[in-house]
């Protein structure tokens, strides 16, 4: 029995990103009375729907890893089954050494089963270095190792710099030579512990994937945008009696002497909104004035980014707070551009990734109108593109204004694709400290956080800072938090043993 066990009662969820909303959804399945508190003026966190040139798009995450069940199942449960759509094309390119090159097949997160799989992407020297893998002695990985460090030791730096780095960077906006292999690419970590040759291990992964005959798309989108998922979850939990209060930042979280939790909010004009059957105000467990409010709960799920979680936990769980304060984040920006289709011709495919070693400004570009049929169908006369700029350790570009980010994006798009037309409209979306970094030892840090919190009944954490940055990982993290406060540690134990992949690592799809 977990030390954080509590019976179903009133549970406050702090944070209305997809993890917090998924936690609320699961709590209602356990017959809890739920209040969700969100500091900003909207739900959804990093999932942000929007519009450019009259076309609905995503200004945050745009796809869901469909080979994991958690997020797709949640979408179906909240009525989005008929809006799930696979990409119209999954063919991508690499912009490297001055040319757009087809993304190689036959690799796992950029790690090839044979040198031939990367022909055309690597130099002759780089391809020859891969062949040495079979003759090298075993590379020990210990309790964890950086993805880049291990792959470079086995196959050479060129594999890391030209392929592993842009693939990992597309998800974490991080540095492959710092990112934990155990947490970020667990399938490679597992085989690295049991195999000497990395290429042989990758071929084994590919053979098992082929034998399993996995069918269906690797990724899935949602008509109208993935940003519609949190709104659908919010509507579903409200319909079941939960209350969601925006513009309600939590300033203090304290354990009650008699058990339960005291949650102090400020700026909470929404506190105790009339007409919500399960609202804190209508059930007598809220108090306060025009500027502050106090809620009392049997349990709390903290579903906010690590720095905010650290501030809330400092009074009651200082050790956990110290661990969370050390979590680093990457900042980046997305530049979305709308063009007249008649003005431009794009290469085939869904877009391209850019290895940092090539020294370009943009890190990737998505041809959104070619990737997603639902975007193209809204206005066949337009083409929507987006680029990403900035990553961990490379923030100087983000000091520039939006106009400059548009200019450098257009420059790199011209160099890569020949695109010279002037866009009809542009939008820049900045995600400051948007992506948590998973350095070597991340799994141990998360375990320590949960160990500290396990001593406090009715308290758990979830979100992108723990079990993976993808949407399925956030949903799985939420499920683990809910089960934990109800005395069931098995979901957390499963997540610890089997980390959720935040990106596809199959047979080179």
Q: Residues of each region from the PLM?
A:
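Mid-domain catalytic core of redox enzymes
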Residues: 2, 246-282, 286-385, 392-398, ...
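Conserved flavin/dinucleotide-binding core of flavoenzymes
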Residues: 2-5, 104-106, 111-112, 290, ...
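N-terminal Rossmann-like FAD-binding beta1-loop-alpha1 element of flavoenzymes
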Residues: 3, 7-36
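Conserved Rossmann-like nucleotide-cofactor binding loop
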Residues: 19, 42, 307
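Glycine-rich FAD pyrophosphate-binding loop
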Residues: 28-52
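Dinucleotide-binding Rossmann-like beta1-alpha1 core, especially the glycine-rich loop
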Residues: 53-138
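Short, well-ordered coil/turn residues at beta-beta hairpins
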Residues: 67, 153-154, 170, 303-304, ...
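Active-site/ligand-binding neighborhood in enzyme catalytic cores
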Residues: 129-251, 296
């Amino acid at each position: 029995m977990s030390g954080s066990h509590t019976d179903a009662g009133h549970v406050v969820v702090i944070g209305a990103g997809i993890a917090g909303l998924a936690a609320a959804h699961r709590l209602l399945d356990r017959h809890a009375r739920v209040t969700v508190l969100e500091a900003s003026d909207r739900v959804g966190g990093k999932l942000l729907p929007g519009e450019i040139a009259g076309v609905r798009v995503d200004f945050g995450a745009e796809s869901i890893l469909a080979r994991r069940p958690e997020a797709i199942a949640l979408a179906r449960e909240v009525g989005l089954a008929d809006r799930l759509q696979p990409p119209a094309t999954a063919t991508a390119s690499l912009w490297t050494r001055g040319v757009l090159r087809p993304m190689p097949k036959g690799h796992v997160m950029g790690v090839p089963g044979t040198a031939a799989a990367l022909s055309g992407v690597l130099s002759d020297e780089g391809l020859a270095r891969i062949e040495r893998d079979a003759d090298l002695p075993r590379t020990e990985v210990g309790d964890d190792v950086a993805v880049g460090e291990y792959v470079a030791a086995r196959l050479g730096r060129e594999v890391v710099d030209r392929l592993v780095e842009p693939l990992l960077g597309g998800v974490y906006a991080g540095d492959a030579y710092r990112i934990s292999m155990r947490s970020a690419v667990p399938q490679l970590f597992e085989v690295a512990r049991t195999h000497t040759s990395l290429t042989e291990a990758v071929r084994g992964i590919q053979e098992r994937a082929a034998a399993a005959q996995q069918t269906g798309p690797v990724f899935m989108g949602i008509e109208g945008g993935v940003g519609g998922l949190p709104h659908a979850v919010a509507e579903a939990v409200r319909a079941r009696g939960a209350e969601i209060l925006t513009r309600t930042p939590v300033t203090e979280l304290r354990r009650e002497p008699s058990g339960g939790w005291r949650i102090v909010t400020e700026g909470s004009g929404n506190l105790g909104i009339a007409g919500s059957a399960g609202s804190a105000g209508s059930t007598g467990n809220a108090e306060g004035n025009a500027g502050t409010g106090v809620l009392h709960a049997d349990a709390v799920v903290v579903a906010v980014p690590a720095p905010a979680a650290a501030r809330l936990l400092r009074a009651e769980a200082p050790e956990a707070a110290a661990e969370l304060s050390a979590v680093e984040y990457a900042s980046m920006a997305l530049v979305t551009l709308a063009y007249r289709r008649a003005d431009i011709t794009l290469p085939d495919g869904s877009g391209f990734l850019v290895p940092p070693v090539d020294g370009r400004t943009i890190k990737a570009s998505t041809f959104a109108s070619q990737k997603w049929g639902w975007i193209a169908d809204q206005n066949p006369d337009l083409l929507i593109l987006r680029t990403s700029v900035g990553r961990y350790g490379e923030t100087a570009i983000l000091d520039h204004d939006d106009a400059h980010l548009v200019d450098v994006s257009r420059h790199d798009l011209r160099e890569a694709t020949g695109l010279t037309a002037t866009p009809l409209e542009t939008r820049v979306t900045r995600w400051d400290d948007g992506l948590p970094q998973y350095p070597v030892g991340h799994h141990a840090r998360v375990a320590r956080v949960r160990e500290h919190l396990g001593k406090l009944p009715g308290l758990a954490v979830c979100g992108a800072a723990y079990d993976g940055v993808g949407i399925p990982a956030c949903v799985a993290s939420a499920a683990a938090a809910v089960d934990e406060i109800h005395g069931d540690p098995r979901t957390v134990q499963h997540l610890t043993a089997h980390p959720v992949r935040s990106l596809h690592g199959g047979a080179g799809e």
